[in-house]
Amino acid sequence: FFRRAAACLAGELRTLLPGRGEAYPVLAAGLGNRGMTADAVWPLALESLLVTRHMVRALPRQFAGFTSVAALAPGVLAATGMETLELLRGAVQATGSAAVIAIDALAARSRDRLCATVQLGDTGLIPGSGVGNHRKAINAETLGVPVVAVGVPTVIAASLLGEGTEDDDSLFLTPRDIDEKVRELGRLI
């Protein structure tokens, strides 16, 4: 099942990226807070990613045909004092990336989607928007290159689950086995 899911995800990503190959460098950006398990999909995803930019540059003949992939985990505003968008702009410029793949945890609107789907889009994303912590948008308009968003819903607002919680938008829940699910989803992405 895992191999089929990974192949399906790779195929969908290929259709969303406007180009491929060594002449089309990509920056993979893991967004979120590494210190919060439900928000830590990205470090696990980046750990499983084959970063090739340094190899393509150092040994161009041996790595001909490889896409140049760089990775960045910019952290959160509270830890860095910088908006994720600012860090990504600098990285896109420094690496000459032609596209960004932004990986983030999301808030589910339905319990059926919680840790059960991978959402893809070509319009970018707004970090933190699912939990009411709106940051600056990460999209083609703000970065100057296409942005493919890869998101996994890992939390759900308690207000969506039942009576007595409708007015509380500050309480978010995760599955009991969130550690295992985040590890699996990070590896899949």
Regions found by a protein language model. Name each.
Residues 33-67, 71:
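Glycine-rich phosphate/diphosphate-binding loop of Rossmann-like nucleotide-binding domains
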Residues 19-22, 61-65, 92-95, 111-112, ...:
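Solvent-exposed alpha-helices and their adjacent loops that cap or buttress functional pockets
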Residues 25-27, 99-101:
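Structural motif
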Residues 4, 8, 40, 44, ...:
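Conserved active-site and cofactor/substrate-binding residues in soluble primary-metabolism enzymes
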Residues 62-92, 96:
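A structural-propensity feature for long, helix-poor, extended segments
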Residues 72-73, 102-189:
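A structural signal for small-residue-enriched, beta-sheet-centric alpha/beta enzyme cores
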Residues 1-26:
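Extended, charged alpha/beta regions that create polyanion-binding interfaces
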Residues 30-40, 78, 105-109:
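Gly/Ser/Thr-rich loops at beta-strand to alpha-helix junctions
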